Amino acid sequence: DMLYSTVQKGGSTPVITRETDYAIRLLRTLADGERHTAAEAAERELVPQPFAYKILKKLSKAGLVEVTRGADGGCRLLADLEKTSLYDLMEAMGESCRLSGCTVPGHRCTWREAHGGCTVHCHLAAIQEKLNGELKAHTLAEILRESG
């Protein structure tokens, strides 16, 4: 699908999880600035409703959308998609793209403690920094913009 690749036995691990892919889709519907019901957005974007509610709750908690309950309720976009990066969305979804556990800040590595350093860590950390930079360089507006 849009950015999501299926994890299969012997396959690849996606950088963008299904939940983040669904979040991008829901934001696509909300990008018109109008108020939409969660059910309407879910149906329009082919996102299963239970996922849509869970995702919209996370997006609301992160301040990206406003969710109003009740008869006149619904959800609408609060975030400026021109200033919200893919990295920001992944963080809002509680995800981070990590090459290795050793690139997680504060990770305790017994190898590095025993040997005083690790060239593998140095290389992975440099690659991780570039990957984070790339995720931060692409806004949701850019990703959602119609091409052609």
Task: Label the predicted regions.
Residues 1-14:
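Short, intrinsically disordered or compositionally biased N-terminal tails of bacterial proteins
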Residues 27, 56-57:
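Short, hydrophobic-biased segments on the C-terminal half of alpha helices
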Residues 63-78:
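Beta-hairpin "wing" of winged helix-turn-helix
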Residues 61-64, 92:
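Residue cluster at the C-terminal edge of the helix-turn-helix DNA-binding motif
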Residues 78-148:
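Non-DNA-binding regulatory cores of transcription-related proteins
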Residues 43, 60-61:
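Alpha-helical residues within the helix-turn-helix
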Residues 16-47:
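N-terminal helix-turn-helix DNA-binding core of bacterial DNA-binding proteins
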